[in-house]
């Protein structure tokens, strides 16, 4: 009993340190898996993609959110305009090919405009890594405002995922629909 009293403070101190360490290991963990449409249109793990976590201010977050929404709207409008000019249901192979080419051009313009928006925060990268063979990635970050950028080139495609992150406890992403993509071949 006397021995227990003597070491009780030490035992409680070590227990507190262990709890702090365990909680720290689980807090603000950002993990995810990324896939993109393959040549058969089935989702394929995006292995070897560059994953970057950028820290940003509240003002930057608002500007980027507004710019992303605006760019997405412009891209959809261009595709709608293309569909009015070149019918997807056309029997003519040339017409369908022209529609695909113009849509790819719209996607390419959208991606380049998105890259320009992201240039504002590129100097604030806090973590970088690549996805493994199953498309998995993971970071540990302090609480704050972040943007997650994932860039890959599967099957002759350029794909870019942009996600805003506000890590709380353990944030897990399952990304399959890129923010923008285009064909590198025509």
Regions found by a protein language model. Name each.
Residues 32, 131-139:
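Glycine-centered loop-to-beta-strand initiation motif
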Residues 130, 151-180, 186:
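Structured interaction patches on ligand/partner-binding surfaces of diverse proteins
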Residues 40-47:
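A short beta-turn/strand-edge loop motif at beta-sheet boundaries
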Residues 47-76, 81-102:
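Extended low-complexity, serine/threonine- and proline-enriched intrinsically disordered segments
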Residues 135, 143-154:
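A short, solvent-exposed beta-strand micro-motif common in secreted/extracellular proteins
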Residues 61-77, 81-83, 109-134:
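Short, acidic Ser/Thr/Gly-rich low-complexity loop/linker segments typical of extracellular
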Residues 8-22:
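Hydrophobic membrane-insertion alpha-helices, especially the h-region
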């Amino acid at each position: 009993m006397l021995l227990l009293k003597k070491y009780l403070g030490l035992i409680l101190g070590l227990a507190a340190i262990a709890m702090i360490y365990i909680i720290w290991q689980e807090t603000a963990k950002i993990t995810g898996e990324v896939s993109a449409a393959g040549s058969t249109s089935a989702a394929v793990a995006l292995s070897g993609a560059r994953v970057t976590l950028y820290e940003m201010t509240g003002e930057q977050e608002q500007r980027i959110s507004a710019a992303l929404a605006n760019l997405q709207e412009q891209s959809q409008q261009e595709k709608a305009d293309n569909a009015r000019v070149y019918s997807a249901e056309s029997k003519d192979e040339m017409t369908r090919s022209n529609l695909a080419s113009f849509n790819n051009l719209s996607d390419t313009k959208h991606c380049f405009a998105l890259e320009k928006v992201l240039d504002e925060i590129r100097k604030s990268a806090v973590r970088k890594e690549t996805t493994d063979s199953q498309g998995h990635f993971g970071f540990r970050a302090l609480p704050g405002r972040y943007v997650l950028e994932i860039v890959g080139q599967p099957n002759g495609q350029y794909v870019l995922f942009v996600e805003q992150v506000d890590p709380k406890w353990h944030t897990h992403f399952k990304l399959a629909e890129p923010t923008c993509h285009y064909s590198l071949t025509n």
